[in-house]
Regions:
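N-terminal first-folded block
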Residues: 5-48
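A polyampholytic, Gly/Pro-enriched intrinsically disordered region
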Residues: 49-52, 96-107
Length: 138
């Protein structure tokens, strides 16, 4: 069973929407203190074989966090977008088939970005999926 772990920066509503969409989700706050360093939770997520979700676009540039992703074999998906978390979560659920296809084709460790569909795509199809792009390693 695929388990998604949501970083604290995605709040409480994001994982609720994913759960309502049928995903198995573990929240940061259910396992760690608010001030737990990212490299510590990344280690645990990697050890458990979970898929990590974050909104932190800078994580790739933080050596200790990037190294934790690599060292602990973490599949990390960065949810990209300056939108309310509800919109980001709904777009993630809509994009899930592409996320699953990406996960099936890429062996951890990696960092990938998950994008919402463009406004033009959603104007044509309200349920248009977004896209997933490998970010690290290149």
């Amino acid at each position: 069973m695929t388990v998604y772990f949501t970083d604290r920066d995605l709040g409480k509503r994001f994982p609720e929407i994913l759960r309502a969409g049928g995903l198995t989700v573990e929240r940061h706050g259910d396992h760690f203190a608010h001030d737990t360093p990212d490299d510590a939770w990344l280690e645990e997520v990697g050890n458990r074989g979970w898929i990590a979700l974050t909104h932190d676009r800078r994580i790739r540039y933080k050596p200790n966090e990037r190294d934790a992703v690599i060292r602990h074999g973490v599949p990390l998906l960065v949810v990209v977008g300056a939108a309310p978390f509800q919109d980001l979560a709904e777009a993630f659920v809509t994009t899930l088939p592409r996320v699953e296809e990406f996960l099936a084709g890429h062996k951890p460790p990696f960092i990938a970005k998950v994008y919402r569909p463009t406004p033009g795509e959603t104007a044509k199809d309200r349920n248009a999926p977004g896209r997933v792009e490998l970010w690290y390693p290149r």
